[in-house]
Design a protein with these regions (language model features):
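Active-site-adjacent substrate-binding region
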Residues: 81-159, 165-169
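Acidic/histidine-rich catalytic neighborhood of metal-dependent amide-processing enzymes
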Residues: 1-10, 15-85, 117, 121
Length: 169
């Protein structure tokens, strides 16, 4: 379902992360976009790909594309959410760099600190050669229900922020 300001459907959680990556891929000139599956049911593919990408391309940082929850501090329509922490804590120097670039971009964003939840970043952080990573996602209401809802402006901000960061990191 679509209204003037929102898109609402089931299973938008993972789909929005993929949609974001595909939109960024349309204009990306230099970077890697990597899709993995099975992470919520055992994992392992992220760490395999991480070793290959780091060895071949010397990449050691990642942006994790997904959604986050609309909460008291993360507002619907307030811009893409940059997570300073979920079940893991990304390296402060990398978080600070991303926030600095986000401010320079003039793209609407909001900061969040999650008390729970997580992402595939665990595989990146716990690896033999850890990467810098940060989770950035559009705030979603009614997560994991048939009525997941995201503000269109937050989706646009998410796509724009990823494109900007991929160019400037």
């Amino acid at each position: 379902r679509e209204t003037k300001h929102h898109i609402q459907c089931c299973y938008m959680d993972n789909r929005l992360g993929v949609f974001n990556a595909l939109k960024v891929a349309e204009t990306l000139e230099n970077g890697i976009i990597c899709f993995t599956c099975y992470e919520e049911h055992g994992g392992g593919t992220v760490s395999f790909l991480q070793r290959f990408i780091q060895k071949k391309y010397k990449v050691k940082q990642a942006l994790i594309s997904d959604i986050t929850w609309v909460t008291e501090g993360v507002k619907d329509g307030g811009g893409v959410a940059i997570s300073m922490r979920d079940s893991l804590i990304p390296r402060k120097k990398y978080v600070d760099r991303v926030i600095e670039l986000a401010k320079q971009s003039s793209i609407p964003f909001q900061l969040e600190v999650e008390g729970a939840g997580g992402s595939d970043a665990k595989e990146l952080q716990m690896a033999e050669n850890p990467w810098d990573w940060i989770f950035i996602g559009a705030p979603e209401d009614h997560v994991h229900t048939p009525d997941e809802k995201v503000h269109k402006d937050d989706i646009s901000a998410m796509i724009d922020m990823y494109a900007y960061l991929m160019k400037h990191l």
